[in-house]
Amino acid sequence: MGQHARLQGPRLRSLPELRIPRYAWLLGMTTLCALCLITAAAAQDIASFEKRITLKKLNNGLTVLICERPEAPVFSFYTHVDAGSVQDPLDKTGLAHMFEHMAFKGTDTIGSKDYPAEKASLEKVEQAYAAYLRERDKPIDRDENKIKQLETAWQDAVKQANQYVIPNQFTEIIERNGGEDLNASTNYDETNYFYSLPANRFELWAYLESSRFMHPVMREFYKERNVVIEERRMRTDSNPIGRLLEQFTTAAFQASEYHRPTIGWMSDLNSFSATDAENFFNEYYIPSNMVLTVVGDVKAGEAMPIIEKYFGRIPSHEKPDERITNEPPQNSERRVVLQEMAQPLYLEGYHRPDYLSPDDAVYDGIADLMSEGRTSRLYRALVRDKKIASDAAGFTGLPGNKYAHLFAFYAFCMPGHKPDEMATAIHEEIDKLKTQDISNDELKMIKTRAKANLIRSLGSNSGLAFELGINQARYDDWRELFRQVDRIDKISKADIRRVANKTFTASNRTVGIIETAAPPSAQPSKGGE
């Protein structure tokens, strides 16, 4: 899920109704107990929390973190793969997201009626597609008749391979065994896989989860690629906000890999192959590039040997190179303006350092001050008092936060008001940050909400698994989850003013605007005036 979810809405995957009773009341009990646990941990120290956590790096390089939480007989997991759209090859954008889809298609033992025959058929599919692509993409001397013949041969090969497929077998096994919240997400920085199961299905989970990252099969690849193409059409090409965000991001990042859309460019979606996806998997889905977190009714002494038995089978490889292109300093404002039949919108973003910056907590504090709830500065000024916007906020982490990224502000215009008014009002609030100290009450509220948000985020097994996993992956230490609250607690009024003056400058700003287009003029009817 992208960090600009407030603009786009969450990415959801529809799932069939489960076939066994859900564990809603147990999960509720888990949440209640978790609040007590985390509150106590925050009030005391990390040591009390450490008693429940076991951390181990397997011989193949996989980092495993287990948190014992026995309040309900369920567990959740979070598999973090340190590869997102930033790692997409230049001419194959969208490949990280595409493989996420393929990870649900099964393995060499799940999802096939006859895998040896299917494997041979899939090889023929790739051969036919490569021949079709070579002719289709010739810069000169293309033979249109030959292209049609090769396309037909490729599609016939796909049909032949599809006869061996058992659709959705991987997900149905999980659901039949009580799986909940089965999903995955790809963003610019990483790819995540997660769901929950009853505790007595732990070994089944270990087999399933390790198998899909050991023996994935690129079955139904081109069918699923069409699903992704349609997803792009719906979320970007046919969506004014999606179009703005894509063009805004490419304007703000001209060198950094953040200028590539996670969904991928349409020409790349229409070109990359199952072989490309398999190559991406082989390079990035390796134990040293992954963190596995399990939280729930499991005992580390029993669970870790099971994890080693199954996940330890995955071959070890050297961690891939993480170097990316650094965005050079911006020296003048950039603007993107779209004319759309849509509600007018004003968006602006300012370059800021990555999440390892000493000022990361200060940026979080500014985001809280400007945007958290109906008492936030932007909501009060633009929505409540001036009544010029239907919504207004600021947030950090656009489009990701692992590398240098943007701190953004936005406002949706009320009828009769224009984006320029939003810009003026937002800049007035930014200028206050630069020239005036925030109040004692505001500073206290920033720090109080940071602690409350931590407690809230860890209330469920899945939430805790995510937070522990992402911090272990990013900092090589899950304890950073709690240290971030300590860093926010040390923010001063002077820090807010200093960072605001350093970051929120006109030359460092990229602006994105949606202006409401005039409706098409009525065409006079024949014979009329």
Predicted regions: what is each one?
Residues 67, 72-85, 94-96, 111-211, ...:
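M16 family metallopeptidases and their MPP-like homologs
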Residues 32-42:
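C-terminal segment of classical bacterial N-terminal signal peptides
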Residues 93-105:
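Active-site recognition of the HExxH zinc-binding catalytic motif
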Residues 1-20, 25-29, 33:
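A cross-taxon signal for low-complexity, glycine/charged-rich
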Residues 40-65, 291, 299-338, 351, ...:
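Proteolytic maturation boundary segments
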Residues 233-235, 249-250, 319-377:
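His/Glu-based metal-binding/catalytic segments typifying zinc-dependent metallopeptidases
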Residues 102-107, 201, 212-220, 232, ...:
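A generic secondary-structure signal for well-formed alpha-helical elements
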Residues 218, 225-226, 233, 241, ...:
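Non-catalytic, conformational "gating/processing" segments within enzyme and secreted inhibitor domains
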